[in-house]
Structures are given as structure tokens and as C-alpha cells.
Amino acid sequence: MDKFQGYLEFDGARQQSFLYPLFFREYIYVLAYDHGLNRLNRNRYIFLENADYDKKYSSLITKRLILRMYEQNRLIIPTKDVNQNSFLGHTSLFYYQMISVLFAVIVEIPFSLRLGSSFQGKQLKKSYNLQSIHSIFPFLEDKLGHFNYVLDVLIPYPIHLEILVQTLRYRVKDASSLHFFRFCLYEYCNWKNFYIKKKSILNPRFFLFLYNSHVCEYESIFFFLRKRSSHLRSTSYEVLFERIVFYGKIHHFFKVFVNNFPAILGLLKDPFIHYVRYHGRCILATKDTPLLMNKWKYYFVNLWQCYFSVWFQSQKVNINQLSKDNLEFLGYLSSLRLNPLVVRSQMLENSFLIDNVRIKLDSKIPISSIIGSLAKDKFCNVLGHPISKATWTDSSDSDILNRFVRICRNISHYYSGSSKKKNLYRIKYILRLCCVKTLARKHKSTVRTFLKRLGSGLLEEFLTGEDQVLSLIFPRSYYASKRLYRVRIWYLDILYLNDLVNHE
């Protein structure tokens, strides 16, 4: 990375024109790149000439391949049979795969440098905790309680290939690299039938880069309009002050009206909008009226259709009222719940009760969808009744038990932030009984006979180490009173969601 830093230290006109020397300079033989920013692979790899092509790619071979392709009299035209179209002793699809990976690695360099420069001079302690999926929920608990409407948007993808090329053109000024990128991209589309049949040759890193570039372009337009809209000459909530002088009057309000109008101050300090993007979706939480929410919906539909040339249906943008509707967010069902509080106050001989209502974000487990996923993977039927896992009966007893314990712990770990643990106990019960039925089927016995022979110690593995750790963290009286099961716990080590069955 330090070696390539010099290419990025030119003036603004040449800052992004670095792909050409990286592709064609003779001394580019080894390219070391940090995969820590890539969620698909968090190890550090070095691209060497003799690397294993299944996991690593040689920049030297790729450079030779590019030169050889430019020396050809004609371009490679794909045929119906992938084996008939060979190039340098290998299929052309193999080389398109290798080139696309190296292209994604090179183009990611300015993004990684930009991200690193954004953290310079800032003291971020334990920033790795912010990468956790659960770290989003504590922020939402503080923010969503002040909002009443949420706009749930499904980001459309894919779009036209030429739109992706034009998006990248704003960041890369090298025309040769853009033409080569367009050529490889269209070749990938010509081979799309083979991608469906052979999933092992998919290049998730290349398409992840395209998706991130596409979303970055969309968000840059959205945030620009959002920033401009906050300074328009319009009324602000109930206080009827022009927003153009909104920030200048906040200090005056704190001095004069802090004792008389605390509710108005709360409205003034509320952010205009709260934006969260996750898993190809985004949500916009705001305190606007239904009319303004429909205007935001109309804006998104026209943005995708007019600017990105994508047919975007209005049904993909849902307006949810948090006080009435449930918001499906990262596997949870979130909604606002009124939590009444009664405070007893006593002054000398007089005592009185104060009724307060606190708005709290309630996160629940979507039991129906989880049971549907378990039924799809043959852990239970559609009604939630456990059944034996027939495909696992060929494994050893310890392997079967470890698989069930791992799945049970992962689900318990992720849904520990639920406000109601009753549904979580039901899921654990399904997995425990499914494990017993699977072992009984393997040994050609009934469940009752199998449990009598081995005893109840078989299911002790399902008592996760999580409960043991929590018993050490919280006071013993607190843990013994079972109040811990009503507490929401967010973990900061969940970086990504694994497959339910195939996770090792």
C-alpha cells in the first residue's frame, strides 16, 4: 500500500488515474492488499505468481494475460460450450474471473485510503465494536423513540451495466481501464447461464464492489438533497421559525425559554431524519407528517426511474407507523411501546404519585419466520413440531450433537436482545427435541428408550456457556431472581450472519 501511495499524491485531475500504471508497469509482480475491509474475507493475503488460483490470484499472470489479449487480432467471442473456448490452455471464463478479482482489488485501493484518512486525528476507542450488527440497536433505541414514521426502502439492483460504468467513470479517469472494465463486465453477463449452474466460479468480491459503488452514488445524491432541504425557507415543526435561521436561534432559546418551553426545545433538538442501510435495504425514520412521508416515497421512486433508469415500483417503499406497525429490521420485529411509570414523591407530610409514560423501542423475535426457516431446513414441520434430521444420521453422535448445539447457541446469542424470551425458549425446545429424535433414529430406537438409556445428561450441552458467563457478570441475587431473562443484551462480536445449517 505504501508503494502505491505515490500514484495518489498528484493533483486533483490525476488523483484517480492510477489503474493504467498498475496494470501495465513491468515491475508490478506482487500486490499485497489488506482484506480487513472486506466482509467476505478478513485475512491478509498476498497475490503471488505461484498462488493457488482458488483462493489467490497472480497479478503477474493477469498482466501477461491483458497484454496477450491486446495482441490478439480479434476479441474472445464466447460460445455455447465453455470448454470449446479456451485461451492460453484454460477457459476464457477462468481468466475473466481472475482479471475481475484483480480489478476489484486495485479499484478498492482509493476507497480504503479514503477510509483510513477519515479516521486520522479522531480518537475512536474500540472501533471494532461498531462493526457488530448488534451495535446498531442501541443507537436505534435512542433515536427511534423520538420518531413516529419509518420509510422502509428496498434498494433496486441490478441496474443497467452502462450505468455502473458511468458511475465508476466519475472516480477513475483512465479511459483504457474503463473500456477494459466494460469489456469484462459484458463478458460476465454473457456467461451468466454458467454462473447459475456453477456457483463455485462466482466472484462475490467483484460484484460486491459494483454494488458498493452503485449504493455510494445513490447515497451521495440523497445526502446532498437532504442537506440542502434542511436549509430551505420553510417552517420548522410547531414553533413557526424559518429553518434558514434555525441554528442561530437555538442558543437564544436555551438562555430565555429553557424553563418555560422544554417540549419545544425537545422538538428543536430532534434531528430531521435518521438513515440506516442494511442488507440491500434502507430505512428513514423521521417525525414528519404522512404527507411528507409520501413526498419522500415519491422522491425515491423518481430518483431510481429518472436518474438510474430502473423500473422501481412504489410497492417497494413502505411507510410504517411505529406506534401501530412492526418494522422488520435485521431479523427483529421492532415497534414503539408505551411503558407507563409511576413515581411516588413525598414532600414533608404530603405525598403524591406522578404518572409518566416512556416510549421504548420493543424488539421481538419473529417466531413465525424462524419456524418457517427451521421447517425449510427439515428441523420441524410448518406447525413447529420437531422432526428428525434424516440427512445427518450418517454422522457420528458427537458430530450431530455439536451441530445442534452450535445452531442453538448462535440463535440464542443473536436474539439475546429480545424483550421477550418466551419465543426464544420455544426455538431451543424445537432444536433439543429434533436432536434427540435424530439420534434415536440413527440408533433405531424410540425417543423415550433412547433417553432412558443415556439419561438427561445428553441435553446438558444445550445449556450454553452464555448463561454461565452472564452469571459471573451480573450479581448473584439478580441472576437468581431470573430477572436476567427479561433484560435485553446486545453483543459486540457479531460481525455477520452465518447460514443456519452449514455454519462450521
UniProtKB/Swiss-Prot annotation:
Reported effect, residue 119 to L: In strain: cv. Per-1 and cv
Gene Ontology CC, one term: chloroplast
Domain of life of the organism encoding this protein: Eukaryota
Gene Ontology MF term list: RNA binding
InterPro entries registered for this protein in UniProt: Domain_X, Maturase_MatK, Maturase_MatK_N
GO biological process: mRNA processing; RNA splicing; tRNA processing
Sorted UniProt keywords: Chloroplast, mRNA processing, Plastid, RNA-binding, tRNA processing
Localization per Swiss-Prot or TrEMBL: Plastid, Chloroplast
Pfam families reported for this sequence: Intron_maturas2, MatK_N
UniProt signal peptide: none
Chief subcellular location: plastid
Keyword Chloroplast: yes
Purpose of the protein: Usually encoded in the trnK tRNA gene intron. Probably assists in splicing its own and other chloroplast group II introns.
Protein family per UniProt: Belongs to the intron maturase 2 family. MatK subfamily.
Protein name per the record: Maturase K
Species of the source: Arabidopsis thaliana (Mouse-ear cress)
Name of encoding gene: matK
